[in-house]
Amino acid sequence: MAGSKACALFVVASLFGSGLAAAAEQPSAAQMMDDLMYGRGPVGGPFTLTDQTGKQRSDTDFRGKLMIVYFGYTYCPDVCPTDLMAITQALDALGPAAGEVQPVFITIDPERDTKVLADYVSAFHHSLVGLTGSLDEIRKVANSYKAFYVKVQDERSGDYSIDHAGVIYLMGRNGEYLGFMPPQTNPNRLTEVLRKSLAK
């Protein structure tokens, strides 16, 4: 998607500007963003996770619709709620056509998020599905989407935050990767991209 590459470079620069290093079990932020921008290898793939109601859901459940996939966490103070609200506004702007789009929020913090996931997703679009799983399951799905994230421990408080790329993924009706949009994409731009994708 035109314009996404330049913004994605800012995402990578921001991550490294914070002095972050990628977790050992995943590629670096720069490598994953390069793979996304330049189409190096597949993006997405099969998964089976648990939704906010406790039901197992797989990627095949959403076939026949466009799928918006967003990796984030409920304790995220700014980027996640901003992006999820933009997705909500874009879907509202689509009107009845929004029924052909399935938004999916995959938590990258299942240790804290699983119990509060239902309440969290209810604050956004009514069709938003929240997905959780074990740490290994989430990492596997994130890696298949080339979604970078790393836990950052605060030694003083004993708490942690999670740094992540906040990329908005768009998947086709058959689960194929269509492209990505950077964090804080304008809702009007999201609506435009969705309309064009639905028309194909």
Task: List each model region and its residues.
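N-terminal secretory signal peptides that target proteins for export/translocation
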Residues: M1-G3
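Bacterial N-terminal signal peptides
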Residues: C7-S18
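Sec/Tat signal peptide C-region and signal peptidase I cleavage site
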Residues: G19-A23
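N-terminal "domain-start" segment that seeds a small globular fold
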Residues: E25-T60
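Short loop/turn microsegments at loop-to-beta-strand junctions
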Residues: G44-G45, M67, A165-V167
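Short active-site neighborhood of thiol/selenol oxidoreductases, capturing the structured segment around
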Residues: D59-P81, I87
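Structural microenvironment flanking redox-active thiols in thiol-disulfide oxidoreductases
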Residues: T82-V141
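Thiol/disulfide oxidoreductase modules built on the thioredoxin-like
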Residues: E137-V193
